[in-house]
Amino acid sequence: MNLDRPCTDILTEAWQRYAFANDAGPYLLIPQAVMQPRTEQEIQAILASSKIKRVPVCFRAGGTSLSGQSVTDGWLVDIGRHWRSIESLDGGQRVRVQPGAIGGLVNAHLKSYGRKIGPDPSSINSAMIGGMLSNNSSGMCCGVVNNAYHTLESIRFILPDGSVWDTSQSSEAVRFRTEKAQLCNELLAIREAILGNPSLLDKIRRKYQQKNTVGYSLNAFVDYQEPLEIFSHLLIGAEGTLA
């Protein structure tokens, strides 16, 4: 792991950095560098290096954000460059995609099966799956029932400490409880506090019956019991702040 150059593809020229200085919103922040990782190992190296150098990191997919979520004056990590794999499963009943895949192209891939993904944001032909998960995309047609949160089966993610987790593997729940015991205990404590407060429990249930993208997906504490499942669903709508 080369912490001085954590990624093969690093853009540092002024014109390159200016090209990534804004997204679809009105904000302008010029990144110190734009990194385009190809592997999980490079992402781990970026996270480790940023911690040592004390440089903030912002991950960006399609850059269709309207509120400045995908701009930074630190290191901008562009995952839309290389992470574009789309794989249909079970005759199109499920689809496994990387975060740089454009939503519209995923639907085009599924069209022959008569299927499409749940979220249908207006930016679907530009927005990428990573961003759609990060802001819990929905749309005019899918509503809440088929938003990103409710149509997620499993997710593979990297924590800021570099550890990799894959919720499609049944053994991961036990490993998560073992290696992330403190985090698990805190998640379960929050869940117990919510379940023990009838008015708060009712409020969370009511609030998430309609589109709600303010803050973290607190309904994860109500919908799931296993810490890894709670955490993985907190990632949906977390704007990349957790993993």
Regions found by a protein language model. Give the residues of each.
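N-terminal glycine-rich flavin-associated loop
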Residues: 25-57, 75-122, 133, 137-189
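Polyanion-binding loop/helix "lid" in catalytic or ligand-binding cores
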Residues: 190-229, 233-234
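Beta-rich nucleic-acid/ligand-interaction surfaces
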Residues: 124-130
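Conserved phosphate/anionic-ligand binding catalytic regions in large, soluble enzymes, centered on
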Residues: 63-66, 132-140, 228-243
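N-terminal accessory segments
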Residues: 1-25, 30, 49-57
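Short glycine-biased active-site loop of nucleotidyltransferases that positions the nucleotide triphosphate
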Residues: 25, 66-71
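C-terminal substrate-recognition/cap domain of FAD-linked oxidoreductases
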Residues: 11-20, 220-228, 232-243
